[in-house]
Structure formats: C-alpha cells, structure tokens
Amino acid sequence: MEQIINVFPGLVSFTQMPMEMAIARIVLIFMGFGMLYFGYKDVLEPLLMIPMGVGVCLVNAGILMMPDLIDPSKQKLGTMFLDSMVQTSDQHINAMQVYFLQPIYALTFSNGLIACMVFLGIGAITELDFFIGNPKLSLMLAIPAELGTFLTFPIAIWMGFNPREAASIATIGGADGPMVLFASLKLAKNLFVPISVVSYLYLSIVYSGYPFLIKALVPKRFRGIAMKEMTITKVSAEEKLAFSIVVGTVLSLLFPVAAPLFVSFFLGVIIRESKVSRYMFFADDIILTGSTLFLGFILGCLLSADVVVEPKMFKLLILGFIALFLSGVGGLLGGYAVCWLSRGKINPLVGIAGVSCVPSTAKVAHKCANEVNEEAFILPFAMGPNIAGVITTAIITACYVTKVQLL
C-alpha cells in the first residue's frame, strides 16, 4: 500500500508538512470549490471568484517536494505554479524556467502592471457625466466613504503592524483592488500576497455583503427615494476628453508616485470618449477581461496553505473587514448628510457608492433602492461618487506611499 501511495507525490506531501498546514490545505481545497460554486451561482463576483476558486483549489492540491531555487541542495514543499519569494535576478530567471505562471507574475504583478491594466479597462467602461456635472456632490459623498482608509491605519499600528504595513492594509478600505496591489508593492512587499488575497476576497463579497449593512442602517422610506427632482447634466465628449487630460495631468503633477494609475484610468476614459471602436474593444473585451482573469487566477494560486497559516493572516482578515465596514458606514453617513441638505431629494444610498469598487457599490445602491421602489433608478447618480471614490482613493494611497516611506 505504501508503495502505491508513493507513486503519487501529492498525497505523500501531506505527511511531509506540519499538521496545521495539512489541515489548512484541505480546508482551502474545499474553499476553492465553494468560491467556484458561489461565483458560478452569481452569489459572489463571478469574474473574480471563478478563476480564483480554480487557483485556490488546484494550487493546494498540487503541492510536492522539489528543489529549493535559492539553495538547490535542499528540498522544500512547493508547486509548479509560481514562487512569489524569489528576489535576485538569477532566481527570477531560474524560476521562469520552472514555474509556468512565473513570467506573468514577474512581469505584471511585481511591477504593478496588472493594476494599471485593470485601471485602463475600468476607465474604458466608466461614464463621467454625473461626476463632471456634479463634482462637489460627488466628492462630498466620496470623502466620508474613505472612513475605513483613514481609521484602519491607527488600528493596524495598534495591532502590531509597522506604519508601512498599516498603510498598505488601510487601503483595503478604499475597496479598490488595483490600488491595494499598488500600495502593498510600494510599502509592504513582505505582505503583498496576504494583503492582496484578503482584499480581493472581501471585494468579491461586497456585492452580497453591503446590502445587509444598508438594510440595517437605512429605513425603507429613505431607500425608496426616487431622486426624480435631480437631473443629470449632459456632458459632451469634448468636455470629457478635456476633463480627463487636464485632471490626469494635474493629479500626476501633484501625486507623481501614483501617476501610472492616473494615466491608465484616464487613458481608458479617453479611449471611451474618442469613440475609436478598435481601441474600445481592445481596452474592454481584451485588456480588462484578460487582466481580470489572470488577476483572479494568480491570486488564487498565491493562496496556498503556507500563506493561511502565516501568523499575521488572521489579523489581516479582521482589519480587512473593519476597513470595508467602516468605509460602508462612512459612505452611508455621507449619504444621510446630503439627503438632509437636499431636504430629502437625494437618496442616501448613493453615499455607499463612494466606496470605490467600480461599479459594484453603485450597483448595490441601485439594487437596494429598486427593491423598495421600482421607480428609484439611482444608478446614474451613484456613478458620480463611485468615480470620485476612485480619485480620492488614489490620492490617499499616493499620500500614504509618499509620507509613510519617510517614517
């Protein structure tokens, strides 16, 4: 029997690892099945959960004993997927010849390119009308929705993280996945994998989780406000093009550390408004779809048992939840404020759209309003603070990266 088992190194690897890691590995395999299933059923975000679930399931199944790239004379448990711990150029070259996902990881994740590609795609599907027509209102709603980004920083320091790690974790409150990737690469490379995985796990739950927060904090009579007295100013394509190039230039000038993200986002917007069909197809159907697929799959492949048993992982899960919860509460408080200032003309649910998970939080706000009042079509109004949230999150992230590096 032992000889038969030894033919299958994946099974043998269970006996070569600590008990807690073996248990975590089994749990993660089933968790991968769950992510895939709930993504397929549209309970969780399918674009992320389906590839991530496949990655989590298969990477934890495919563990075996193999030579250590750093010291080939030693053996270690690993996979044939990728190694996120390689550092020197020689190790990178050797890893690319062993791990099939290593080239994609090294050339798109390690330098933040994947975040820029996602941002370009998001820009290409973003409608700016309400934001440009009502910039003050949009920003008034977006700033309170950064509550988690501000408050999670001191909480993370209190829980034992250094300022650079705390700032990276705090960006989860902005609910902007590419921004979290960017911040963790700049500030806390040692926690890049767990922070990225935790952020995208929670972001995939936003669509199903925030409705419970909304129903707990906002009575039906407010949720059903139809905003019929509000109008959306029609903005011409020329105005959007001018806005994109001017604002992108100013933001890059003020916050050059985040210039790659600003450039990517506003280039996507310019592609959309220029109406060049080939560019629009390329940015949306190819770049955004392809980068989202590889983002989800590689993040899933990074979620191996050794990451889960990392002592800081439990703290990261707590802090990620706190960050998104506080941002959701802050967004709704901002929504209540503008509802009061407008004497009930504005639905407070547009406030939660300031949490910049584009366009998920805007869709959540619209869905919850529409459930109460079928005439409450607030999606166009929610997109304003949604886009403003992207900009405020980028600015706060740039401030964290610039200032915290000096500590």
Predicted regions and their residues:
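N-terminal alpha-helical transmembrane segments of multi-pass membrane transport
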Residues: 1-77, 81-83, 96
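Membrane-embedded hairpin module used as a gating/binding unit in multi-pass transport
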Residues: 200-276
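Interfacial helix-loop-helix linkers and transmembrane-helix boundary segments
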Residues: 40-49, 69, 104, 125-140, ...
